[in-house]
Amino acid sequence: IKEILIGRGLVYKYVENPSEVAAKYLVRNYVVGWFQGRMEAGSRALGNRSILMSPLKAENKNILNHKIKFREHFRPFAPAVIIEKMHDYFVNPREEGFMTCSFDVVQEKRESIPAVVHVDGTARPQMVSREANPRFYDLIRGFGELTGEYVVLNTSFNVKGEPIVQHP
């Protein structure tokens, strides 16, 4: 990654703990391009090639759909939650690491994480364990320690009609 950045004349800064730095940017409501680890294939971002944003503001869904993803306004975004907290957010959840099932969002949390709750009160979450993806887990945990909500908005690192990015 460093060679590509230098080759393109881009300014960069190496950080010791990217999870901590990214969590702090999310708290400030920045959009974070999260690129780490192995490539991902398929239509779901699972924490290696992701666009991340805070789920705490409803308008973040519109910002991503219109200004970054260039897609329809009604398209929902998925929450990524650390597995230990899944029962705090979802009714009868299972350990779903691949965003394949929808669950009802606990009523008390619907207003706390509006950017990732579908119009019918459900969400299609990714439950993230430290064993499966340590850096992504640490990012979500760090966001939770700063905000009280152990969830981030996670969408694929691409724009409408394009594949997920594979390299920097």
Regions found by a protein language model. Name each.
Residues 1-168:
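Flexible beta->alpha loop and helix N-cap segments adjacent to enzyme active/binding sites
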